[in-house]
Amino acid sequence: IISKKDKYAVVSAGETVTLPGYSFETTGDDEPEVEWLIDDNSIAALTTSKVDGKLTGEVKTLAAGVAVLTLQVKDTPADKDNYYIVIKPKNAPSSCTADTTYNTVSLGWSKTADADGYTITRKVEGSDTEQTIAHVDGTDTVSYKDTAAQTGISYIYHVYAYTKYTNNGQTDYANTDTYASVKATPQLGKAAMTSVTAEGYSSLTLKWEKVDGATGYIVYRSTDKSKVDTQIMDITNGAVSYVDTALTAGNTYYYKVQPYCVVNGKKVYGDASGILSGKPLP
């Protein structure tokens, strides 16, 4: 019945939609009398009138949701056709936060009361290519963990609110025009030294905890606690201990360890550990 091929209109709340025209295959001179019906007056208001014998109508959208408009032949409900008006949420989330670990960004955002859920997009900083990475169903579901991010790469995340609907048998999402945004760079965890012990003559043994994703560790040493910045070893074999030799007995040595991984041929560093000290045996 409805002449328009695309029977979905996606709009923002407050917009007015003009209903499409219609036609019938009839053998007589007169077309049957028809009427427009709406399924939910709380999200949209329907007004109709006749112009040159044709029924026309407008729909004033009020709130987020999917309004189903039915054009049917009066007294013959089987002769009908539907037109769908998808109304986006009024507002996007107002804020978004991000926590990072190795190859992971954990997002959180403020709730949007009239949303069916949220669309998450991501792009590399400096790029114009925005990629949809998730649709999160549920008004109250306000977090998402991106485990496909890469350590050392800066990303821009956008969070949209959406109205969910079915379009020709396929699930689709009507996103808000605005969004909450946050920048995040996944990074290695902080190193943690566990001990510096004198186990041999003029030497100290350093131990630390394994950092997830680290491919190596830089060991720093100094005799000045306020300036532990001299690199003495680059551990590349995944070891989490190191024996520092040829030290002077009786002196106090200060150490810290910094993890790193290699991304696109470059070292990306995590935070260095706290400082521990030790004295070699005489």
Predicted segments with their positions:
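Extracellular Ig-like/FN3 beta-sandwich strand-entry sites
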Residues: T16, A64-V68, A115, G152-S154, ...
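An aromatic-rich alpha-helical recognition segment common to small helix-rich domains
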Residues: P93, W109, I120, D146, ...
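Beta-strand signatures of extracellular beta-sandwich domains
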Residues: E35-L37, G117-T121, Y160, G216-Y220
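Pro/Thr/Ser/Gly-rich low-complexity, intrinsically disordered linker/stalk tracts
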Residues: P89-A113, T151, N168-G213, A249, ...
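Beta-strand-rich modules
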Residues: D146-N167, D244-G265
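Extracytoplasmic soluble-region selector
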Residues: I1-P89
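Recognizes extended acidic, P/S/T-rich segments that occur
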Residues: T119-T151, I218-T248, N264, D271
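Extracellular acidic loop/turn motifs
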Residues: F24-E33, D114-G117, S127-D128, G213-T215, ...
